[in-house]
Amino acid sequence: MAERDMEQRRWERLITWLRDRGMQADGLKVERRPRSDGGYGLFARDACAPNEILFSIPATAMLNIKTLRPLYASWAQKLSATQLISLHLCRHRPVADGESSDPAFGPYISTLPRDFDFHPLTWLVEDGGHPYKILLNHLPPAVFRDLKDLEMRFSSDWAVCQEHLRDVKRTESDYLWAWLNVNTRCMHYRVKSSASDPDNLALCPVMDFANHRPEGPHMQPRPTKQFPARADMSFVAPGANIGAGEELYFSYGPHCNRKLFVEYGFALRGASGEVDVDDLVEGTIQQREDGKLSQELLENEGYWGDYTIHSSPEPNISFRLLAAMRLLSLPTSQPPTSPNEAVSAARHPLGFEQWQQTLYGSRDRLSAEIEEQCKISVLQLVEHIKARAKDALAALDHLDWNGPAHVMDMVKVLWEEERDVADTLLNFNLPLW
């Protein structure tokens, strides 16, 4: 109860600070409340009409390169948005249960999560044997691969920023806390002339208490102007009536659980069903006698990697996976002896040129025999995925785990998604192409 009272006081101080920044906070239609799962969410205080403006956040209350660069010397101009916002949070991280001493954004920083023990990047980066580290050995291969990629992004930013943190004696652990706040809570906010510039992001008070769910209804952001920067940001109710006390959600996008887990640190049953099968397909290719050649041919055509299977919106395999499986279904004597031979049409082996035509859109299918072999190979792949997922889930059931049940459940959801996507494809009449 004491912790919730403290969080409520922080919420009240945040609203007072926002009011001082120009926010119209009288009769505020939303508030942060505890959820039944132990976390927090954003809830409607009163009934809301469809598309009604719920709240507006002044541009000066958001953390982005426009609001932070004036607080630092010229070296800050060279930092990316992620690096600069993370650096500022790191410098002003609250100590223990205390409040942030930042004179510019302290009341907001004090409302941010105090730790990210639940996030897999913490398990990977923290020294001293994090208690959840054992779960890293039980992640799907594609999830662990993407997590290592995230670690590289973090390490790169830490290498740039650490020299600007020595005066306040901040550690890599402090920067990890700050960086994960940025990576998990920032929203798109236009500050650059190019709409696709990676620096178009900001931490936005109040909005960042809203949880994600894959399907609507959702709140929607409405900037007061598209550009130039420094636009206030309004948030409108979903296009349906919202009752008093209902939770308000925000959408991070139609992500599969691999993305949600690696980037945001959670997984949801019912997320967009997708399984990355790069490790299985690439492993199969590399074990073949003609594996090096097959890899080169796929690379030359731009079809190496990013192989996926899906259960929604309809069960299917990606065209990239289909291209690879068709190539592997050609008789081993058909591909040219080197990629250079493909330059000469006269030396194209039987079936290889037709395979290329399926990539360019001038041909829909290969011969019935090759398509049948492709179907068999896809079925074997999907069966392998299902069996691997079942084995992984059984191993998790027998793991000596003393941590929180919801953390273990996240990892199980990843494997359940792989199993269920495979099941869905097997229950359909392949081929689906």
Annotate each language-model stretch with its function.
Residues 2-61, 66-70, 109-433:
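Long, positively charged leader/targeting segments at protein N-termini
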Residues 66-121:
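Eukaryotic helix-linker segments that join adjacent hydrophobic helices
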